[in-house]
Curated annotation (Swiss-Prot):
Region of interest: Disordered: 1-41, 95-213
Domain H15, chain residue ranges per copy: 36-109
Protein's name according to its UniProt entry: Histone H1.2
Biased segments, Basic residues type: 20-35, 119-140, 149-160, 169-186, 193-213
Compartment list: Nucleus; Chromosome
Gene name of the encoded protein: H1-2
Modified residues (N6-methyllysine): K34, K187
Modified residues (N6-acetyllysine): K17
Amino acid sequence: MSETAPAAPAAAPPAEKTPVKKKAAKKPAGARRKASGPPVSELITKAVAASKERSGVSLAALKKALAAAGYDVEKNNSRIKLGLKSLVSKGTLVQTKGTGASGSFKLNKKAATGEAKPKAKKAGAAKPKKAAGAAKKTKKATGAATPKKTAKKTPKKAKKPAAAAVTKKVAKSPKKAKAAKPKKAAKSAAKAVKPKAAKPKVAKPKKAAPKKK
């Protein structure tokens, strides 16, 4: 009995895993159903635009075109009628004959051109925004550059006192030179006086000449 008892719980886990696999398989199937194809309104507009009839496309001709495109007309008959009504109310299609979904339908050219124009306007409006953004960036760049100019100017102001100090030193130096010149002149005058005092010394040999021994 001890050998058969652990075999029962070992068989239970695979039974629990199987429903998880089934759920995982169901999710992609649901996603495929949703993304089976484009909506009915797009198919109707394409079929009406492709037709060359001036009076418009009838419901029977529209169903044939949808069936040729691979759309299940029998199952989605109510959706086709609702799609036609919604497109007429929006203005994308114009009903040329009949009432409701039983008449003939034609593509509204004014609505098609009107839809194209707002897109072009939006694209044109988007460009000035980018230009405005670029202008803001340039303004920010210039605003950031102005402090640099002020920073450059401040050292110049600091340099001016240094230049003034140099001029003061230059102004003081001539005074020293002027004060030094009189000293040199005094020395030269003293030197000039000394030779005058030396002249009487030359007369001494004359006194010694008359002496006789």
